[in-house]
Amino acid sequence: MTGAQLRIGTFTPSLLIDLARSTGRLDRAGLEVTEIPVPSSPAQFRSLETGELDVVMTSPDNVLAYRFLSANPLGHTLPVDILAGIDRGLGLSLCLAPSVTGLADVRDRVVGVDVPESGFAFVAFSLLERAGLGPDDYKVESLGSTPRRAAALTAGTCAATVLNAGNELRARASGCRVVSTVADIGPYLGTVMAALSADDPTAAGPRNRLAEAVIDTARDIVTGRLRQEVLEAAGRLLGLEDPEARAHLGCLLDRTHGLITDGHVDEASINTLIDLRRRHSPSPDLAVVASAWPTMLTAAALGTGPRT
């Protein structure tokens, strides 16, 4: 019998989706999931709005921006919900190009971002600020998704960018340097699963089942049940050699940077996102965000959903 079909937009190929499929969780949930790579966060949310995508893996800052702030790249808000928290950044790090010997050399050079008004960009700006570099000390250039920025960094198109999800490991193996991580800023939520609000159970049901399947897969990884499967998928999907694949597995298991095993979105990490926006993109609308953000969470993200 054909399962419910879902199209999910991702920046970097998702090990969780891949392993949920290979372990049979998607089949048991009655789901056929197609993963579609997206070039940037504006493109991702534009496709979500038009119905080209049903679900996205994205930064929670994107959800805050597109739900509450009309001054987002689309120019209007969307009724988007967080279905589950996925990870805490997966090694989100400030990285330097092979030719850049230190942070001082970033001065007057290009810092690559997805788009300037985005959560990962704010992390880059904050980590550079901690190193003594302000916004007038470098040029900001939109280079798109994390894999695209990793390629640009390795090629020397930009001097610095933030990378994660195995991209930082592949870049380091190509001669790039990791100089700081998002943990230097505070508790962080790197990826969530999100979708447009859906009151119709025929639409909401498959999305919620996908969130549950991914959460359960994350739990299996963290408890050590899928070690070899993770290493194989890291090589096949992310292009990581064995040492980098093992480092990525360690990152998935790490409590500071790794997977979230219950889907819960915590207040401290959301506050970090809001504080970063206040510093790097101040807006009076952020006062509303600070009080209204729980309204974007579904039961699993609130930590109240049913568990199997």
Protein language model annotation of sequence segments:
Residues 2-133, 159-165, 179, 187:
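Short, glycine-/small- and polar/acidic-enriched structural segments
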Residues 35, 140-142:
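A structural preference for short, hydrophobic beta-strand core positions in alpha/beta folds
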Residues 204-283:
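Secondary-structure end/capping motifs
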Residues 71, 148, 154-237:
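Pocket-lining segment of extracytoplasmic ligand-binding domains
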Residues 1-3, 307-308:
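Short, low-complexity disordered leader/linker segments with a strong preference
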Residues 274-308:
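Conserved C-terminal helix/tail region of periplasmic/extracytoplasmic solute-binding proteins
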Residues 53-56, 154-155, 252-267, 299-306:
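Short amphipathic alpha-helical segments at helix boundaries and their inter-helical linkers
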